């Protein structure tokens, strides 16, 4: 019986080990895609300060964005891919479709928050993006941006603390008090 039971248990356990190795490899590839996307964007932002052509910017921006999209397709239940894409489209998309992409950025940050309701970085960036968008004073975007920054600030997210300290006058004028 022992001779039969041990190989049977080993066969049952083997797929778990194989799946764990596959998942680990998938996770490493996922993180690599996100990192590559951010690296392309960092390089692009530095060169944008030196004013490259719009076509060149969009070509390289698309490559960075594709890295985030590939990461989301690979592991759609992970928050990092949505933060990556939200950051890309929300803050760095240029041209006439910028406002539409900012709204997509808000949706991606919201998706990351739905995956992890305590993801302070997503709250922070959704708040910053909301405040940076053209909006009406007192709009729903305005109110949500204030709530998001407050959540990150009250939970000691360093960037939110710095933002609040630097923009107290703006926040007060926008009825976003701390």
Residue map of PLM features:
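TPR alpha-solenoid repeat register
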Residues: 81, 122, 160-162
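Residue-level recognition of tetratricopeptide repeat
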Residues: 78, 119, 157-159
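Canonical positions in the second alpha-helix
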Residues: 71, 111-112, 151-152
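Terminal, low-structured helical/coil segments at or just beyond the last alpha-helical repeat
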Residues: 24-28, 140-178
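Structural signature of tandem alpha-helical TPR/SEL1-like repeats
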Residues: 56-66, 95-111, 135-148
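Short coil/turn linking the two alpha-helices of tandem helical-hairpin repeats
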Residues: 37, 42-53, 86, 91-97, ...
């Amino acid at each position: 019986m022992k001779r039969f039971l041990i190989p049977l248990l080993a066969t049952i356990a083997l797929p778990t080990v194989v799946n764990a190795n596959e998942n680990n490899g998938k996770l490493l590839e996922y993180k690599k895609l996100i990192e590559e996307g951010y690296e392309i964007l960092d390089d692009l932002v530095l060169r944008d300060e030196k004013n490259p052509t719009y076509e060149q910017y969009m070509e390289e921006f698309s490559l960075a964005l594709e890295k985030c999209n590939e990461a989301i397709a690979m592991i759609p239940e992970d928050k990092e891919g949505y933060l990556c894409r939200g950051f890309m489209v929300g803050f760095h998309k240029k041209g006439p479709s910028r406002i539409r992409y900012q709204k997509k950025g808000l949706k991606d940050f919201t998706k990351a928050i739905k995956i992890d309701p305590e993801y302070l970085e997503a709250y922070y960036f959704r708040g910053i993006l909301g405040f940076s968008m053209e909006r009406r004073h007192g709009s729903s975007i305005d109110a949500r941006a204030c709530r998001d920054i407050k959540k990150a600030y009250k939970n000691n997210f360093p960037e939110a603390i710095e933002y609040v300290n630097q923009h107290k006058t703006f926040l007060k004028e926008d009825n976003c008090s701390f």
